[in-house]
Amino acid sequence: MASEVTKMNDMINPEVMGDMLDAKIEAQLKLTPYAKVDTTLQGVPGDTKTVPSWNYIGDAEDVAEGVEVDTTKMTASKSTFTIKKAMKSVSITQESINSGLGNPVGQAESQLAKSIAGKVDNDVLAEAYKAKMSSGDGTSQISYSGLVDASTKFEDEEDGIEKVLFIHPAQEGTLLKDSNFISADKYEPGVMVKGAIGKVAGCQVKKSKKVKLVTYAKDENGTVTISADNLAEYQDKVDPTVELKAGDKVKALAAASQFYVCPVIKMEADSEETEYTEDELPAITIFLKKDTSLDHEWFPKKQIHDLTASRYYGVALTNGAKVVLAKFKK
């Protein structure tokens, strides 16, 4: 029998690992599956996207016989953003591969997948938190009543329009004890979205540790003054519907006053005829320029493998009318 040699590509094959990486990323995404993926930028020049959104002209009015109807000005808003890249890289020594302990190549693959998935989810949630519609004041714990108030903010004209509510795992116990909560095992397979724990007030419920806990509040008597250096840090700690600027002051909230901000995302269009047209944009859109790729570099003088994962994309809140931020006491 001829001798066989194990080559480097037998251990680290970027093409094979890239496919596995994509599969693992998809499995680990928590929020991204509830955004629409737009691939119109793939394979075309340019890295900037302008997202339009028409404003409603209002309902029609009664007009008397022989009277000329007044014209209504159409208005639109838009946001422009630049495609960015998310990257993560790890180094593996040849010695660690040779040792055969712990499968370092497989572990690197899993860690890179988790890293890219986490970044995309963070960006999706950040866009959801730009929504202007909110419900509650954060003084009551999560409940059926509070979620009904949040869900009806959409003013749906059709029944049964699918919505997804994201809660922090710390809120799960309270919700499970609510008599109006229906656990996922009570539904037929395929009815619930992947990973949903149940349904309440017309919303399927998913858990995510990325749901924001508000620990600071804007206050003119606050002890911390906002500057360019700490603006991003404290903006992430206050109610997302509050916009901080340099010179503002914030104060820490006592534990009893802290609250979660739970996004409720409307998943369906109000009408099948207008689904995801310019007039009926989805809540959040991921503009994918280049899907996740994996590159492998070998440095023989150091006997080190570098594995680098990257994804080029942009995320935008494309329809703020389809996101409500529900506030519930910690």
Positions of PLM-derived features:
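N-terminal low-complexity, intrinsically disordered segments
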Residues: P45-K78
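Sequence/fold signature of self-assembling virion shell proteins
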Residues: A2-Y34, Q42-P45, S77-I83, D178-K330
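Short, solvent-exposed loop/turn elements at domain surfaces
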Residues: G58-D62, T174, V214-T215
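Long, contiguous amphipathic alpha-helices that act as assembly "spine/axial" helices in icosahedral shell
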Residues: V51, T75-D137, E155, D159-L165, ...
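Short N-terminal helix-initiation segments at or just after the protein's N-terminus
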Residues: A27-K36, W54-Y56, N103-Q111, A269-E272
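Flexible glycine-/small-residue-rich
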Residues: S53, P169, K207
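Extended, solvent-exposed, turn-rich assembly/linker loops in the middle of proteins
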Residues: K130-C203
